Amino acid sequence: MKIPQRTRGYLAIVIAAVLFGVWPSLSKRVLTEVHPFVVALLIQLVPAIALSPSLRRLRIARSDWPLLALSGVVGAVAAPIVYFYGLERTTASNSVLLSNSEALFTILFAYAFLGERATPREYLALGGIAVGAFLVTTQLRFGDVQFLGFLIGNLMLVGAAVCWGTSNTASAVLLRRIPIFPLLEVQLIFGTVSFAVLVPLSGAPLAVPSDILPDLLLLAASAVGMFSVLFFYAFRTIGAMRTGAILPTSALWGILAAFYFFPNETLSVVQVVGGALMVGSLVVFYLFRGPTETRAAGETLKPEASDGPDSP
């Protein structure tokens, strides 16, 4: 039995949300031993090498280069710098919470610039996902979140989310004309080349401790490479707004990843309720999904999200 394309899109973003949830805890572990610039270089270099064959016979229209450069510089250079330095200046719980703001900006930008809309019932389910993510990440223990004590780091994480939301919007437009693998490869090249210059200029040591190397490779392969492919595939099949709406479920997986890396922690009742609300809302969001709306003829910002190709 063939799985419908839109269903594959929802499955792709659900899996991507799991990988996205692992990102903060895994990054926090790696940053304890490796300089942020070196982390940003290596986690983009590894998938860039793996995807390099996709550049064969690639042709990019001259009119697409400004948008492609914007997505590469903002998403693969500026965002990692701000994110990793912000991550060093805040707590793990704050990073899980604030990582979800990328989904918020992706939804807002899809609404404002891509002309995407959802049905009233989808908006209701979206609200349920947001509330569930809020419960999972905060546990309603606001004294532990320490926003004021880590204000600079928190603001940097939000700034990184704005950068990635901007890059996501540009990518959603470019995916209408450029296949997933080549687009991702060009963006990774932007990041790899930029950090290859920044690392020696900063004087950061390239040496990676052997006990951290597996975490770094896992971060590169899963949280960057696999996540980006699945994320872009969801863009093409269900649209940027619905992709961004489901991404906050990463908070649940982020908490579970934190328990794996820090086994002394336990789930609270509030987190169990929040996780159930997120999963239930996700099911409702899928069951009551509506068709992706398109703009009037002549308006080209909205990608043909529901009619993308079957393969990257």
Language model segments and positions:
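Glycine-/small-residue-enriched transmembrane alpha-helix faces in small-molecule transporters
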Residues: 1-38, 43, 144-173, 256, ...
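Juxtamembrane helix-entry segments on the extracytoplasmic side of multipass membrane proteins
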Residues: 5-9, 33-37, 41, 60-66, ...
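Cytoplasmic-side transmembrane-helix entry/capping segments in multi-pass membrane proteins
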Residues: 13, 64-73, 118-130, 178-187, ...
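Specific transmembrane alpha-helical segments of multi-pass solute transporters/efflux pumps
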Residues: 19-26, 55-99, 133-135, 220-238
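Hydrophobic/aromatic residues within transmembrane alpha-helices
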Residues: 30, 39, 86, 112-114, ...
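Transmembrane alpha-helices of multi-pass small-molecule transport proteins
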Residues: 32-78, 105, 163-167, 184-203, ...
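Helix-helix packing/entry segments at the starts of transmembrane helices
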Residues: 39-42, 80, 95-101, 170-192, ...
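Hydrophobic transmembrane alpha-helices of multi-pass small-molecule transport proteins
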Residues: 46, 51, 69, 109, ...
